[in-house]
């Protein structure tokens, strides 16, 4: 494919120094996927491109691309900054992990579709002050399908029962009802409420998810469950997750 100028709408989420005065910046877009951009001269003092490519800048960018490999950022049109993320280390850490997680589920230029909408949802909610932990758990549960390990949350994986008391089994890939608790050694021994939270945030569309308020004990239990699901099914080793976990200790 020949190189062409193209307008893309997206979110800058990662940048690093490239050569003396240039940057490499990653942008997440809905139709064109994740693109690595060369931003020439961005490290020079008066560069307008530097501010437009700060992490978590969302806007319209004009790029020179062939649809594979590195593309070049030529200019930008409208860019929105999320100031709340710059002023708050914790918000920044949660958002960085979310975008890193999505980044690892796709190859470059692979369309993101609904997962881009998920990224925008998380970015806006965290910037607005909605519970960082719950937004992150929502994203983690919904991203399992992107990694090819979507759990069965609608009904018991053994008998198909949709109502009742449930627990979660990583080995079986979803929820199991109380009729089978004695036979399923791999269940996580979550409370009915904790399992219900996983089902709710995993199944409901993001536009129907309001502010989910949970006590710290429930959030801690669901976080441990989700982390274990990821560890035993995907085994990602993300630096952003390690940093986030370290922040939570303080």
Curated annotation (Swiss-Prot):
- Alphabetical list of SUPFAM superfamilies matching this protein: ArfGap/RecO-like zinc finger, Nucleic acid-binding proteins
| Database matches in Pfam families | RecO_C, RecO_N
According to its UniProt entry, the protein's GO biological process terms are: DNA recombination; double-strand break repair
Q: Which GO terms describe its cellular component?
A: bacterial nucleoid
InterPro entries, per the entry: ARFGAP/RecO, DNA_rep/recomb_RecO_N, NA-bd_OB-fold, RecO, RecO_C
The lineage's top-level taxon is Bacteria
Q: What's in the keyword line of the UniProt record? A: DNA damage, DNA recombination, DNA repair
Work out whether the entry's keyword set contains GTP-binding.
no
Q: What does this protein do?
A: Involved in DNA repair and RecF pathway recombination.
Q: What is this protein called?
A: DNA repair protein RecO
Gene symbol of the encoding locus: recO
């Amino acid at each position: 494919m020949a190189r062409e100028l193209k307008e893309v709408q997206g979110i800058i989420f990662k940048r690093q120094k490239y050569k003396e005065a240039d940057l490499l910046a990653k942008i997440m877009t809905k139709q064109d996927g994740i693109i690595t951009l060369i931003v020439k001269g961005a490290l020079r003092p008066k560069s307008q491109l530097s501010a437009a490519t700060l992490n978590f800048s969302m806007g319209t960018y004009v790029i020179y691309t062939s649809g594979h490999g590195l593309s070049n950022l030529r200019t930008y049109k409208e860019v929105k900054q999320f100031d709340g993320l710059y002023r708050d280390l914790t918000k920044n850490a949660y958002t960085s992990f979310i975008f890193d997680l999505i980044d690892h589920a796709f190859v470059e230029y692979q369309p993101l579709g609904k997962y881009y909408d998920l990224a925008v949802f998380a970015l806006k909610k965290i910037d607005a002050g909605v519970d960082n932990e719950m937004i992150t758990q929502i994203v983690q549960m919904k991203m399992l399908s992107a990694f090819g390990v979507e759990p069965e949350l609608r009904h018991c994986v053994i008998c198909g029962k949709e109502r009742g008391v449930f627990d979660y089994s990583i080995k079986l890939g979803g929820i199991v009802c109380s009729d089978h608790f004695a036979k399923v050694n791999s269940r996580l021994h979550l409370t009915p409420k904790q399992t219900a939270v996983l089902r709710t945030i995993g199944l409901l569309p993001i536009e129907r998810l309001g502010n989910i308020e949970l006590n710290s004990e429930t959030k801690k239990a669901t976080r441990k469950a989700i982390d274990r699901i990821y560890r035993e099914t995907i085994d990602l080793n993300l630096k952003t997750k390690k940093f986030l976990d370290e922040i939570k200790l303080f």
